[in-house]
Amino acid sequence: MTHTVVIGDARRMRHVPDESVHLVVTSPPYWQLKDYGGDGQIGFNDSYGAYINNLNLAWSECRRVLHQGCRLCINIGDQFARSVYYGRYKVIPIRTEIIRFCESAGFDYMGAVIWRKVTTCNTTGGATIMGSFPFPRNGILKLDYEFILIFRKLGRPPEPDPAAKEASRMTIDEWNEYFAGHWSFPGEKQGKSRHLAVFPEELPRRLIRMFSFAGETVLDPFLGSGTTMLAARNLGRSSIGYEINRDFLPVIRRKAGADGLFDDAKVEVLEDQPLDAHAAAEAMRALPCVFRDPLPIERKTDPRERTYGSRIIRERS
C-alpha cells in the first residue's frame, strides 16, 4: 500500500489524476472558527459566500478524481454565527449548501448519518448553557451532533477482483451498525493530537469499510492530523491526503507508518503551490453553481481578535 501526503491546496489537486480514487472521506474546516495557518486556507477571515465557494472548488475536484459510481463522504456540523462577531445568534446550516452544490455538480445525494458526539470545537458559541436559562422562549439548542453526508458520483463503479471482494466482506452486525442512520461515539479528545478539529479513527474506519474494497485508494482533501490516512492504512487501503499546513506533517507521517514501525508502509510527501486569488476566482466562475448569500451577515469584529479565532496548537516533532 502507498500513502501520499501533498502539502498543497484541495481546490486544485494537480497530483491526483482523473478517476483514480475510489472513496473520498473528509471533514472540511469550519467557517470562522479556527485559524489553521498556511496560505490559501479556507474558512478563516472569509465571508460566508467565499467560504462556501472555496469548499465547492474542493468538491468539484473530488468529483474529477473519483471513479464513477464511487462515494464522497463529508463530515460537517451546523454552526452558530456568534453574537460577539455578528450581533445576533443564528444557526448556519452549512450542509444545505454542500448538498445543493454536489447535486448540481454530478453527484447523487444518498442521505446522511447523524453522528451524536461530544464536540471537539465550540460550534455552539463557547458556552455550556446557551440562551435565556432558566426562563423560556430564548433557549438555544446544543449542537452535540454532526452530519456525515453521503454522495455517489454518477456512473458504473470499477469491479473489484474476487480476492479483494472477499477480503472486504462485512459481518451482519457490522452492516446493521454501520448502515444505521444514527451513530453514537465520542469525538477525539483535543489533547491527544493537539489538533483541535481532529475526528476519531472510528469515523473514517466505518466509511472505508462501507464504501471501498481492500487495495483501493482513499482520498482526504482536508487531511489535518492524518486520521483518515491512519484508518486507510489499518484497513489495507492506499491513501492520498492534501493538507495546506506543513506543520502537521510530523504527526501525519507517524500515523501513516513512516516512522519505520510498519515495514509495508510507503509514504511519499509532495509539494504543491496554493491556488492564488486570481486563479481561485476564475475557477469559481466555471463552477456549475456559484453560491451567493441572500442575507449576508455583517461582521461586527475581526475573529482574529477573539480567542475563538485563535490559531490552532500545531503538532510538533
Where are these regions (language model features)?
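Conserved P-loop NTPase motor core of helicases/translocases
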Residues: 271-291
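Core catalytic lobe of class I
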Residues: 1-251, 284, 289-292, 296-317
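Compositionally biased amphipathic helical and low-complexity segments enriched in hydrophobic
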Residues: 24, 236, 250, 262-263, ...
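Conserved SAM/SAH-binding loop
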Residues: 7-12, 269-277
